[in-house]
């Protein structure tokens, strides 16, 4: 039975309840009702009319309702990533199926108060009809597994053609002018089989530890170049993998073999916005977890790239460039330096390229991430020239970060013909309620018209997209995912998206990051602890000296500590945590609250949203007289100090709280858990997957302050009765991180993904040429005019 049939049957059987429910919605004096509003209306109706299981099941599938007499337009999500649209007349109660376009057009009319003129409809759907796609929602985010199975099955169903494609792919690889794998680039499968047999026979007679340099003369005579292995054992292992594929190909064997090919030695990573540096930047505007993520990421990737190249006998030092914006007015940061080596790496560098105006003038000051769109096209051209010079050639992979970095990655990938990977970190669209339909009201402040257009361009251009969690793509049974919100939406008078992204596209892959294991390790490891930092930490938390950028003094220092650390912005919701703490006498009696974030003086911030949150913090502390129970540190901590602070809080049997209204992933959560600190984190976003509730931490609803305060208070009271409760959650957190969230696992997966997508792009024509033409037109006719208009407004 379809959803519309369900509603029709429900109306026949429970006409009074359906009519009463619709009447309640229409009299709510709101045209747009959210999921929570629709469910609240149902609960009230059930009190009057009794409960209908069928009606309840229907309403609990609703995501949104638009009510303008006499019609109710409804958006339903019967399954993850699958949507239906319908309307029902408030008097006749006969449901009718709608197209996406009809639903969005009605929504626009209701919001604007008048019929909308014809606008551009954006539809990427037709371009992907012939492309392999997943069918089950549970498989979303496992794209490379599906793609490898699907395409290897098709490829090797034509054995000769498949073998030829594979050999052609192996024959084109070279690094710094050095030919790899095959020296003669033979496509004759029979000749290659003979070469492999002869090589393996020879290798059997040698000591397995014989290095490649001694093998090279004989291997060269047989047609083999470096890349098979660093010694005889590894060469034989790699050659046997290829022989197995030629004999009886399978997706797993192909993936294992491709992971051995030394095809990634130069990596370009893009992160334009904010203050990207290694010191004195965290907490500055638009500068937070993404910087930490990338710096930890490149350390792991460089090591993985180096180890793989060495294992395959390729004596080349890999190079990684992180490209960001050069800011001449950089304060006490290094963001005005063109080139900076990344500490802990051998050949990884931060390359800074300035934003320039059309006349070539360099822009000296920081620019909000919401206002950088006019500068990215010129920036991309400058980056292309400087990055190629630094790398000594084309990169093997381009990784974009956030909306701006992904757009620049799109421009560069198109020009250079290089595999493109996108990492969104956080898509703004799900952070701001109705930010698409009311985009015009937000335009002066956030310029979402540019950002959402850039997002559509980048996500449809990418060869593969990496996310930290499943929810980031497709949400949960209850709520839509970040990428899912781009499937269909409307920006009145601009364009209407009826198919923006396909969540079942195999480009989506979940690869979760970790915490730096050298910095964030268990509190119970005394030999690695930085004991010399303890006096400084105690001074930060307990000292009432006036020379610190702090407010509040903890009158009772023996209480356990509730700790939080984040930027001061509305979404991070630190003021929400302070408010729920202030409103709970029980929680205030059990624990003190320690906050690290933002500035104490709003005049020291240049970010308007941060300034608002600073004022709100002071207001809450004044109103609730919190100065003896809350310690607020308006400062940035270096990594070692932050790591030891987590462990010090754990020593005191405290907890970490992450109260964000939404969190795409949550690196601070991983850091806290890796330190053994019990963690309470928002249920909205990635933390719902990271934390196993009541096993490795706790989920909280930041919109339910009283319930959150009670949950935390219950935990502290249980610990007083049974200290083993704290130990149980602490150990659960450590186990969870070790099994799922480490940078070593991340780097291994990223390198495998890049090789597989590079291979399939080469052998099967995954260029999506038609889509690229459409995207090119969309960029020039839609994004560029929006960016130019913004340039004249700011």
From Swiss-Prot:
Optimum pH is 5.0. One of its GO terms (molecular function) is sucrose synthase activity. Its EC number is 2.4.1.13. It comes from the Bacteria. Optimum temperature is 75 degrees Celsius. Retains about 55% activity after 15 minutes at 65 degrees Celsius. Pfam families: Glycos_transf_1, GT-B_Sucrose_synth, SUS_EPBD, SUS_N. Residues 263-742 are annotated as: GT-B glycosyltransferase. Inhibited by GDP over 10 mM and by over 2 mM MgCl(2). Coiled coil: none annotated. InterPro entries: Glyco_trans_1 (IPR001296), Sucrose_synth_GT-B1 (IPR000368), Sucrose_synthase_pln/cyn (IPR012820), SUS_EPBD (IPR056736), SUS_N (IPR056735). Keywords: Glycosyltransferase, Transferase. It catalyses: an NDP-alpha-D-glucose + D-fructose = a ribonucleoside 5'-diphosphate + sucrose + H(+); ADP-alpha-D-glucose + D-fructose = sucrose + ADP + H(+). GO terms for biological process: sucrose metabolic process. Belongs to the glycosyltransferase 1 family. Catalyzes the reversible conversion of sucrose and a nucleotide disphosphate (NDP) into fructose and NDP-glucose; although the reaction is freely reversible in vitro, the physiological reaction seems to be sucrose cleavage. Unlike characterized plant enzymes prefers ADP as a cosubstrate, whereas plants prefer UDP. The KM for sucrose is 8-fold lower in the presence of ADP than UDP. Its preference for ADP over UDP suggests it may directly link sucrose and glycogen metabolism. Homotetramer. This is Sucrose synthase. It comes from Nitrosomonas europaea (strain ATCC 19718 / CIP 103999 / KCTC 2705 / NBRC 14298). The gene is ss2.
């Amino acid at each position: 039975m379809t959803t519309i049939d369900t509603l029709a049957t429900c109306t026949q059987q429970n006409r009074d309840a359906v009519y009463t429910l619709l009447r309640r919605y229409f009299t709510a004096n709101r045209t747009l009702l959210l999921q929570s509003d629709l469910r609240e209306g149902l609960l009230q109706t059930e009190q009057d009319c009794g409960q209908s299981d069928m009606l309840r099941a229907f309403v609990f599938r609703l995501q949104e309702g638009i009510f303008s007499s006499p019609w109710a337009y409804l958006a339903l999500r019967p399954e993850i990533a699958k949507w239906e649209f319908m309307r029902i007349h408030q008097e006749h109660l006969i449901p009718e199926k709608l197209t996406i376009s009809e639903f969005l057009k009605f929504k626009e009319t209701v919001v604007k108060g008048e019929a909308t003129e014809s606008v551009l409809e954006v539809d990427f759907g037709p371009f992907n009809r012939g492309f392999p796609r997943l069918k089950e929602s549970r498989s979303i985010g496992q794209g490379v597994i599906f793609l490898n199975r699907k395409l290897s099955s098709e490829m090797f169903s034509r054995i000769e053609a498949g073998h030829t494609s594979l050999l052609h792919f192996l024959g084109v690889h070279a690094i710094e002018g050095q030919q790899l794998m095959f020296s003669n680039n033979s496509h004759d499968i029979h000749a290659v089989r003979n070469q492999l047999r002869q090589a393996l026979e020879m290798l059997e007679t040698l000591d397995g530890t014989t290095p490649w340099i001694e093998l090279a003369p004989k291997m060269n005579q047989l047609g083999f170049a470096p890349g098979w292995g660093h010694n005889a054992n590894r060469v034989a292992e790699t050659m046997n993998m290829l022989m197995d594929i030629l004999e009886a190909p399978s997706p797993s064997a192909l993936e294992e073999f491709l992971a051995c090919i030394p095809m990634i030695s130069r990596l370009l990573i893009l992160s334009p916005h904010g203050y990207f540096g290694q010191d004195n930047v965290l907490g500055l505007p638009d500068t937070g977890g993404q910087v930490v993520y990338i710096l930890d990421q490149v350390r792991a990737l460089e090591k993985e790239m180096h180890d793989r190249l060495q294992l395959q006998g390729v004596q080349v030092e890999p190079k990684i460039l992180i490209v960001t914006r050069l800011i001449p007015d950089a304060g006490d940061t290094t963001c005005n330096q063109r080139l900076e080596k990344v500490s802990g790496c051998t050949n990884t560098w931060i390359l800074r390229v300035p934003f320039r105006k059309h006349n070539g003038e360099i822009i000296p000051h920081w620019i909000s991430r919401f206002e950088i769109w006019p500068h990215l096209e010129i920036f991309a051209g400058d980056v292309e020239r400087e990055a190629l010079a630094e790398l000594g050639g084309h990169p093997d992979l381009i990784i974009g970060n956030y909306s701006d970095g992904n757009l620049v990655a799109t421009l560069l990938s198109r020009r250079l013909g290089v595999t493109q990977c996108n990492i969104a970190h956080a898509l703004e669209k799900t952070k701001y309620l109705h930010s698409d339909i009311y985009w015009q009201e937000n335009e002066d402040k956030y310029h979402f018209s540019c950002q959402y257009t850039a997002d559509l361009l980048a996500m449809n251009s990418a060869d593969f997209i990496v996310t930290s969690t499943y929810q980031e793509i497709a949400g949960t049974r209850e709520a839509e995912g970040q990428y899912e919100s781009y499937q269909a939406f409307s920006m009145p008078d601009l364009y209407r998206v009826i198919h923006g992204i396909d969540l079942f596209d195999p480009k989506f892959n979940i690869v979760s990051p970790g915490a730096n294991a050298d910095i964030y390790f268990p509190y119970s490891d005394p030999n690695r602890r930085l004991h010399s930092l303890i006096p400084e930490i105690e001074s930060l938390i307990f000292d009432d000296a006036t020379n610190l950028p702090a407010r509040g003094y903890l009158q009772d220092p023996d209480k356990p500590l509730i700790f939080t650390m984040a930027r001061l912005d509305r979404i991070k919701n630190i003021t929400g945590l302070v408010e729920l703490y202030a409103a709970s006498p029980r929680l205030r009696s059990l624990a003190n609250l320690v906050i690290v974030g933002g500035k104490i003086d709003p005049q020291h911030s240049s970010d308007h949203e941060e300034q608002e949150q600073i004022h709100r913090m002071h207001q809450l502390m004044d109103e609730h007289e919190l100065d003896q129970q809350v310690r607020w540190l308006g400062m940035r901590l270096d990594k070692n100090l932050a790591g030891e602070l987590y462990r010090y809080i754990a020593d005191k049997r405290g907890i970490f709280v992450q109260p964000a209204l939404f969190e795409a992933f949550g690196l601070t959560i991983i850091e806290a858990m890796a330190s053994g600190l019990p963690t309470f984190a928002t249920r909205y976003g990635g933390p719902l997957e990271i934390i196993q509730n009541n096993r490795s931490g706790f989920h909280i609803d930041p919109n339910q302050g009283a319930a959150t305060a009670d949950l935390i208070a219950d935990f502290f009271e249980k610990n007083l009765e049974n200290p083993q409760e704290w130990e149980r959650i602490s150990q659960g957190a450590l186990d969870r991180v070790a099994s799922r969230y480490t940078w070593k696992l991340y780097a291994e997966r990223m390198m495998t993904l890049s090789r597989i997508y590079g291979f399939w792009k080469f052998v099967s024509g995954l260029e999506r040429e038609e889509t690229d033409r459409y995207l090119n037109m969309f960029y020039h006719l839609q994004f560029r005019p929006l960016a130019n208009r913004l340039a004249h407004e700011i």
